[in-house]
UniProtKB/Swiss-Prot annotation:
Binding residues annotated for heme b b566, in chain numbering: H97, H196
TM ranges: 33-53, 77-98, 113-133, 178-198, 226-246, 288-308, 320-340, 347-367
InterPro entries (UniProt xref): Cyt_b/b6_C, Cyt_b/b6_C_sf, Cyt_b/b6_N, Cytb/b6-like_sf, Cytochrome_b, Cytochrome_b_C_euk/bac, Cytochrome_b_N_euk/bac, Di-haem_cyt_TM
Name of the protein in its database record: Cytochrome b
GO biological process: mitochondrial electron transport, ubiquinol to cytochrome c
Miscellaneous comment text of the record: Heme 1 (or BL or b562) is low-potential and absorbs at about 562 nm, and heme 2 (or BH or b566) is high-potential and absorbs at about 566 nm.
Sites where the protein binds heme b b562: H83, H182
Function: Component of the ubiquinol-cytochrome c reductase complex (complex III or cytochrome b-c1 complex) that is part of the mitochondrial respiratory chain. The b-c1 complex mediates electron transfer from ubiquinol to cytochrome c. Contributes to the generation of a proton gradient across the mitochondrial membrane that is then used for ATP synthesis.
CC annotations in GO: mitochondrial inner membrane; respiratory chain complex III
Subcellular location: Mitochondrion inner membrane
Cofactor binding note of this UniProt entry: Binds 2 heme b groups non-covalently.
Length: 380
């Protein structure tokens, strides 16, 4: 077996990636989320595949085909809700994974980090298009509002929006192409994940101290395979509790009403995992400014390596920047709450304040804190 594992051209790649991979001996449970994201992706592809067997991407039958899946297909309700709530679990793991990367300075592995940002955009695009497919009220109006933002692009905006719609409004052509893209993107994401892992294995994993761990590494199997297996069990248990006991808690009641272009819902809002970005978008009165702020809210992650001023890699031994980090986390929670509120006083001003705070903490306060800590510790 050892000979096959180390000599076979295909198996030796798996061996170097998941079995004999030298891994720091001190990585904590925060390093579990990479494998959990892989599990989420597998769950989403499998459940999505079975849903696609029964779904029809036509405006007249899309809504009823989802109802048919839940009512008439064997365990269709389970597959549908596992897919919907699986997306929420996916984003919880994603946010924790990115948060870990920011806290422990993993952004210094620039290729891996940039690949991760591309993956984040790809997953967000996939989730957005997936939300349109049931063709409920929030599906239709969410698609209309978000795609319409592209009309803010000077000169080509309106043409671009109509090109994406495949007509003069969100209609059959839009739904069909969104289904096609929603189906193909997870496979593209899988390929990007392999590139992400390729870059990661070039440098090796970071660790909570941020120090070079070459002198103290252990094989990935059995230590971290068992650790990841435990994480996977906890994730699947959480997903099943969510799916079986609270299937609709993260959804919108409006999406149980079939799409009606003549009736606008009182509050158009995306799924919970986009609310922080939606709040930043809404906090700017200008349409183009809002779109730019929306894109920058994610793209700012790419500036992290440039904004790193500290001589230490992680925040483990940096209390001032730690404080800034947790204020940033609280700020993101406030933005998520605001994104789901109506556009009226006092939510408008809270959203604007939280949006300014978000960019200020990342661009100004955290780099300043790093410099102050260098001076306190006399690290020239």
């Amino acid at each position: 077996m050892t000979v096959i594992r180390k000599k076979h051209p295909l198996i030796k790649i798996i061996n170097h990636s998941f079995i004999d991979l030298p891994t720091p001996s001190n990585i904590s449970s925060w390093w579990n989320f990479g494998s959990l994201l892989g599990l989420c992706l597998i769950v989403q592809i499998l459940t999505g595949l079975f849903l696609a067997m029964h779904y029809t991407s036509d405006t007249t039958t899309a809504f009823s085909s989802v109802a048919h899946i839940c009512r008439d297909v064997n365990y269709g309700w389970l597959i549908r809700y596992m897919h919907a709530n699986g997306a929420s679990m996916f984003f919880i793991c994603l946010f924790l994974h990115v948060g870990r990367g920011v806290y422990y300075g993993s952004y210094n592995m620039i290729e891996t980090w940039n690949m991760g940002i591309i993956l984040l955009f790809a997953v967000m695009a996939t989730a957005f298009m997936g939300y349109v497919l049931p063709w409920g009220q929030m599906s239709f109006w969410g698609a209309t509002v978000i795609t319409n933002l592209l009309s803010a692009i000077p000169y080509i905006g309106t043409t671009l929006v109509e090109w994406i719609w495949g007509g003069f409004s969100v209609d059959k052509a839009t739904l069909t192409r969104f289904f096609a893209f929603h189906f193909i993107l997870p496979f593209i994401i899988t390929a990007l994940v392999l590139v992400h892992l390729l870059f990661l294995h070039e440098t090796g994993s970071n660790n909570p101290t941020g120090l070079n761990s070459d002198a103290d590494k252990i094989p990935f199997h059995p230590y971290y395979t068992m650790k990841d297996f435990l994480g996977a069990l906890i994730l699947l248990m959480a997903l099943m509790i969510l799916t079986l006991f609270f299937p609709d808690i993260l959804g919108d009641p409006d999406n149980y009403t079939p799409a009606n272009p003549l009736n606008t819902p009182p509050h158009i809002k995306p799924e919970w995992y986009f609310l922080f970005a939606y709040a930043i978008l809404r906090s700017i009165p200008n349409k183009l400014g809002g779109v730019l702020a929306l894109i920058l809210s994610i793209l700012i992650l790419a500036l992290m390596p440039l904004l790193h001023t500290s001589k230490q890699r992680t925040l483990t031994f940096r209390p001032i920047t730690q404080t800034m980090y947790w204020i940033l986390v609280a700020d993101l929670l406030i933005l998520t709450w605001i994104g789901g509120q109506p556009v009226e006083y006092p939510f408008i001003i809270i959203g604007q304040t939280a949006s300014i705070a978000y960019f200020t903490i990342i661009v100004i306060l955290m780099p300043m804190a790093g410099t102050i800590e260098n001076n306190i510790l006399d690290l020239d």
